Amino acid sequence: MNQIDQKNEDFTEDLFHGIKVLDFSWVGVGPITTKYFADLGGEVIRIESVTRPDVLRGAPPFKDGVPGINRSQFGANWNTSKKGLGMNLALQESRDLVLKLIDEWKPDIIAESFTPRVMKSWKLDYKSISRLHPEIIYFSTCQMGQTGPQSSYAGFGQLAGSLAGFYSLTGWPDRDPAGPYGAYSDFLNPPIAFGAIIAALMYRNKTGMGQHIDLSQFEGATHFLAPHIMKYNDDGTVFSRIANEEYESIPHDIYPAKDEVRKMVGLGESWIAISVQTDSQWESLAVILGLEAALRLKTIEGRKVYKSIIDSAITEWCSNRGAQEIMIFLQNAGIPAGAVQSQSDLWNDPQL
């Protein structure tokens, strides 16, 4: 490692050295956000109750397949680099201890992810804390935010993803909404939160004043569908499910590939994703498929008309080749393609 690389690595590891975070959050968005600070040199103390532990502690997979409050992979992944403090905040003496901790330890950031009622009932909300510590940056993130007619509704990433519109767009047009994998909004919101908190730190450096950051996970997730929302506002277009297709790319789908060895060892079928995004990519693919006659379909509008024929030709061509082979071949030809990989594929992926 050269001196520049070493300097950059040290800078990254110590980026938030001296920044203190008192973390009351649980499950996804809050813990992921505070982990950014912990991993980059900040000191994070996580407050958690044994009587009502983070529900993520009960989520599989567990170490050695044995369930336990300290054995969840998810719980560990999103809370490494932090210190833990067990405390039952339903008790006044615990809340008094928290206030003493804030007075003496002087955290820069307080993070919480409860519905508005909870921290208010404990008198640990922003209004209560900022009276004594106006420099505090107080980060709140629950599903619906601190205000509005549904602010008391609790929920997880799957619910926020559904409310934000992702489920209406994911799946096949003739089937029920499928939704994206997992608690989708849990992974969309932390970068937004991280940027907002950094901006608040910069503001405090200039003014000496903290502020309250209210990140509704529902609202944050909708930003990733901004083009669809703006299109509706513009001309009333309502987008819906189009399976594996893409409005601006044809062909764009997942095709079955050949891989007998994969089936023999119980890894299931082999699939390849292909996405032609430009007319020049289509020309290259048409030659590979032996569809020289289709070269005249140089625009996406032309290819839409013959989509079923094009898909059939791709399916036939892929049926005699493995997914990895197809991916490498098409990538070398300048055509976006990727093998559909399972966990076992990822484990053995030379790039990873």
What role is predicted for each listed range?
Residues 75, 239-247, 253-254, 274:
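Short Gly/Pro-enriched turn/cap motifs at secondary-structure boundaries
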Residues 19, 211, 270:
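Nucleotide donor/acceptor-binding cores
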Residues 251-333, 337, 344:
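Aromatic-enriched alpha-helical interface/lid elements that frame and gate functional surfaces
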Residues 339-352:
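Conserved PLP-binding catalytic core of the aspartate aminotransferase-like
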Residues 146, 174-183, 205-221, 241-245, ...:
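Conserved Rossmann-fold dehydrogenase catalytic segment
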Residues 1-206:
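N-terminal helix-loop segment corresponding to the beta1-alpha1 unit
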Residues 190-210, 223-234, 286-293:
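Oxidoreductase and adenylate-handling cofactor-binding alpha/beta cores
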Residues 57-62, 233-240:
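Short Pro/Gly-enriched beta-strand edge/turn motifs at strand-loop
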